[in-house]
């Protein structure tokens, strides 16, 4: 009797490789490369008049893959749908089942919170049916966003500027940034003063600094007059120690990472964007080739809001801590953290799958970014099961003429978890103070020096990407799977710009936000959006019907659309010109950003008297494969985009291919993708790499060029093999051969 044939379908080749190693020859593992069905790109694809029925179509460009999967599925006895363990993954599995026409008894759903041999084999032994509540929750979110995007975007085109688009959750995120900017503008600084005295002990050696605290209770010195009055009272008088308080302070470790806290900490400590953090985490989850171990999934699933850890993971951490750091550094029992109310808790917190694989042990198998992020996750998890840090604290009050001054100091007694990991901070901690002499109540001191200083209260800081993610989580806007894309999207749409690592609204963002605030109060309302997330959670839990959620939303939204179109009839909103710090070398004015046929450029506001213009240099992600420098986006004479090293002719690298944020998992070089709309697959251009994709396999759409392009690099591009079209009527897209370093 022939052995049963088993097909396993996952999203990515790397995940397929890792799982295939665990399952063996009786299982064929293939990758769907993400979604194979989706709503159409050219139309809304949702029947608003008949129950919000979606019209799904096969994704363009994946016809051969669909055919391949259909053939493999037809030959298999069982098809295991092993996409990611969340709403999106469940929806992909459902689309696969429908697209491949799989009967219920043949399509089995399996999920892996971590891609390890134990979990993979256990999941295959215990498959389940597709969870249609999860699918419905994903469909509801997808259709909500499609309705808002397809109906609201045309209004923005007509009333503000062509090419604009609107999103449901992104609009709220933009509002948070605009609201913070308005708080900063409206902020009125308040004066206050600090007063420090350096005191010498009387009759004993030693000195210390004391800070003004108040009188009977704490009091702020509001101006210089109040400060000088205190100075007059204490000048020439002795201070007496009135209270000495010594204590032991314990500090417990932070919990293991959730999606939100991982993005925040990676932003603070590694300077990674949320989007980049999730891309690297996905690589670590799906599997990395580790020397001597083969392909291993190194972390648990990275989209989670749970703080839960399995008993097995905590036991493994306990053994590791005791063996490496000693029993005194172990917490003493499983350190269980309480997950916040409202969290879905479907998955564990983010942790390493093999705690014994410490970062240094596998560093040579990881890219720099993989190593840094893995070390962050590994250290945070291990620290969460370690003993508290212990500090000795002392607080001393001294009194003079009815005024109380306070000195404090904190010193570490036992580092505990801090030996492994310390959480980053968005704001600076209070100073721990200088060491203090051994003072007793009744000790006397005299003034050696007085220092007064004026201060002003500061406005709230602009959001960083980390603090915006934190604010979204606290307000219930978005979910772990959407934080990174939201923060990225509002920047891509140029509603928000990052300046000195902080987010500020652009003039365009403020105009769009103003329109939304006036005419779409529900869409832009934080509480309304948070409640919608709760309704989607209810759909996932089987407590609500997804079409009822859509109907309730659309009734109000449709009326807002009608009202807005009527109110804005004949109105065109003007976006203020965006002034830059670039000075026009012709007339000295500050140049402004303009939008032309081929995109944005800098122009002198003195037109028509001054007609000076300049290109805007746009930095791209990734590194030059030739010299490791930054990459810039430039425009050819015909307006086509190409990408070049920031060192220009000194390096000579240029390409029509678009650099991405991804590093090749094999060689670590920046990966590129072909230009064009939609999700393009990234590829490696390093010819020495096993992952290299030849140019003829990249699927170029050729576009005609003329001699001398791109830009000033024409001569170099021809020398490197750039081909010009044989016929002017034949569209040809030049692709420069890579530099010697990339070969």
Whereabouts are the PLM-identified features?
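Alpha-helical scaffold elements adjacent to nucleotide-binding pockets in ATP/GTP-utilizing enzyme cores
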Residues: 18-22, 68, 91-99, 119-123, ...
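Structured, non-catalytic alpha/beta "coupling" segments that mediate domain-domain communication
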Residues: 17-40, 171-220, 384-434, 590
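Metal- or metallocofactor-binding catalytic centers and their adjacent structured scaffolds
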Residues: 217-255, 443
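Core structural elements
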Residues: 141-151, 169, 199-201, 249-261, ...
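Basic, low-complexity terminal or inter-domain segments flanking catalytic cores
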Residues: 2-7, 18, 153, 186, ...
């Amino acid at each position: 009797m022939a052995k049963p044939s088993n097909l396993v379908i996952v999203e990515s080749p790397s995940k397929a490789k890792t799982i295939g190693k665990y399952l063996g020859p009786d299982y064929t593992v293939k990758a769907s490369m993400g979604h194979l069905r989706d709503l159409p790109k050219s139309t809304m694809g949702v029947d608003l008049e008949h129950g919000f029925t979606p019209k799904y179509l096969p994704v363009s460009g994946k016809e051969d893959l669909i055919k391949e999967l259909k053939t493999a599925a037809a030959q298999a006895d069982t098809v295991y749908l092993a996409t990611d363990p969340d709403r999106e993954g469940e929806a992909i599995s459902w689309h696969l089942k429908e697209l491949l026409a799989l009967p219920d008894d043949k399509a089995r759903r399996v999920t892996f919170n971590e891609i390890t041999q134990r979990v993979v084999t256990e999941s295959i032994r215990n498959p389940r049916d597709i969870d249609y509540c999860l699918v419905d929750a994903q469909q509801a979110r997808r259709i909500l966003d499609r309705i808002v995007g397809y109906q609201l975007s045309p209004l923005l085109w007509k009333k503000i500027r062509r090419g604009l688009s609107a999103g449901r959750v992104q609009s709220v995120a933009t509002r948070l940034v605009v609201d913070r900017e308005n708080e900063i503008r409206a902020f009125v600084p308040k004066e206050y003063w600090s007063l420090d005295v350096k005191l010498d002990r009387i009759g004993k050696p030693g000195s210390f600094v004391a800070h003004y605290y108040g009188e009977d209770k704490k009091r702020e010195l509001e101006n210089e007059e109040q400060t000088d009055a205190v100075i007059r009272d204490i000048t020439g008088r002795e201070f007496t120690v009135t209270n000495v308080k010594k204590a032991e302070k314990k500090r417990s470790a932070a919990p293991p990472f959730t999606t939100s806290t991982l993005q925040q900490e990676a932003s603070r400590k590694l300077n990674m964007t949320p989007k980049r953090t999730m891309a690297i985490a996905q690589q670590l989850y799906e599997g990395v080739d580790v020397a001597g171990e083969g392909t291993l999934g190194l972390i648990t699933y990275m989209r989670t809001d749970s703080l839960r850890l399995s008993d097995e993971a905590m036991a493994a951490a306990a053994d590791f801590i005791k063996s490496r750091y000693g029993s005194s550094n172990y917490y003493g029992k499983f350190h269980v953290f309480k997950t916040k109310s409202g969290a879905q808790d479907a998955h564990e917190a983010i942790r390493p799958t093999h705690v014994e694989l410490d970062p240094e042990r596998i560093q040579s198998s990881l890219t720099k970014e993989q190593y840094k992020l893995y070390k962050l996750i590994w250290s945070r998890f291990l620290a969460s099961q370690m003993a508290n840090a212990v500090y000795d604290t002392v607080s001393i009050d001294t009194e003079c003429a009815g005024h109380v001054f306070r000195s404090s100091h904190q010193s570490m007694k036992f580092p505990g978890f801090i030996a492994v990991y310390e959480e980053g901070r968005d704001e600076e901690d209070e100073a721990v103070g200088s060491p203090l002499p051994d003072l007793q109540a009744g000790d006397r001191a005299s003034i050696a020096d007085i220092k007064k200083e004026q201060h002003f209260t500061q406005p709230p800081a602009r959001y960083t990407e980390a603090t915006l993610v934190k604010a979204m989580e606290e307000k219930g806007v978005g979910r772990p799977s959407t934080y990174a894309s939201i923060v990225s999207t509002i920047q891509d749409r140029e509603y928000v710009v990052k300046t000195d690592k902080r987010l500020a609204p652009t003039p365009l963002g403020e105009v769009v936000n103003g329109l939304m605030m006036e005419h779409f109060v529900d869409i832009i309302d934080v509480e309304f959006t948070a409640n919608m997330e709760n309704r989607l959670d209810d759909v996932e839990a089987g407590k609500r019907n997804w079409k009822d959620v859509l109907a309730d939303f659309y009734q109000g939204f449709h009326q807002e659309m009608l009202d807005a179109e009527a109110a804005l009839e004949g109105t065109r909103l003007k976006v203020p010109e965006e002034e830059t710090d670039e000075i026009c070398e012709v007339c000295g004015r500050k140049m402004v950003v303009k939008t032309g046929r081929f995109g944005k450029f800098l122009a002198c506001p003195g037109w028509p008297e001054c007609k000076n213009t300049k290109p805007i240099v746009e930095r791209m992600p990734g590194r030059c494969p030739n010299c490791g420098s930054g990459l810039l986006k430039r425009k050819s004479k015909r307006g086509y985009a190409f990408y070049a090293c920031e060192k220009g002719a000194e390096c000579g690298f240029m390409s029509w291919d678009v650099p991405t944020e991804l590093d090749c998992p094999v060689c670590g070089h920046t990966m590129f993708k072909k230009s064009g709309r939609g999700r393009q697959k990234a590829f490696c251009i390093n010819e020495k790499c096993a992952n290299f994709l030849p140019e003829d396999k990249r699927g170029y759409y050729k576009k005609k060029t003329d001699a001398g392009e791109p830009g000033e690099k024409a001569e170099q591009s021809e020398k490197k093999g750039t081909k010009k079209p044989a016929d002017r009527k034949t569209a040809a897209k030049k692709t420069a051969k890579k530099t010697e370093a990339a070969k």
